[in-house]
Amino acid sequence: MKRILAVLMSTAMVLSLAACSQETAKTPEEIYDEALVKSMSLDALDGDMEIAMDMDMGGMTLGMKMSADMQIKKISDTESEMAMVMNTSILGQEVVIEEYFKDGYLYMNDGAGTKVKAPFEYSEIAGQATMNTATSRDFMDKLEMTEDENGNYVFNYTIAQDKMNEYLSDALEGMDELVGDTGSYTIGEMTGTCVIDKDYNVLSDKVHMVMNMTAEGQEVAMSVDVSIVYNAVGDAVTVSFPDDLDSYTEV
């Protein structure tokens, strides 16, 4: 069970991070691509993410919810700051985990009284840390645009199953210990809604996914809903840290 939950959480985080990239003469594709390019140049973002999972394991159902408040800011080419507070609710229990990245250290508070820190080189993840708030159109096989009552662009899209399955396989490469040698995972359906304002800022992204997975000989059918709302980007972002980081135990 622990292995199944671990891979489910890893998969959801990978997919949620992948899913979330005026003039009337412009096509919907051109408007979306312009917002995507702008999002890729961001050096800071503040967002709230919610993930809801419903799983069916051989007739046994299990629901899990997770929320995350995150602030990420690039200080320089070699330094970044991050604050993320995650709240997970499963089987009637809530677990709150805090993670921070500052001054070359990764800090973690497991919510049970353990507070640790460890040296961490930003350069190790710099190539993977591009802040992108919109889903790449390379994954899509359908994209439709309307406008809401505030004049924002609302994009409804469908993700191509083969492309996303290939992306998921690559993203989770090296995590065989989670699903085991005989484990597998396949996305059966994935759709989303992305809201972009007139200045090409991504305001929110919602994704619905249906997935089947096998781990530890157990077949799991899963429905996942991910919602991300961006509160601020760029200079408007301030990364907030707790006052007691100096008291964390180095490991």
Show where each model-derived region lies.
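Subset-of-secretome marker
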Residues: 21-251
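C-terminal motif of bacterial Sec signal peptides marking the signal peptidase cleavage site
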Residues: 16-19
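Enrichment for repetitive, rod-forming helical segments
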Residues: 9-10, 105
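Positively charged n-region of N-terminal signal peptides that target proteins for export
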Residues: 1-4, 8-9
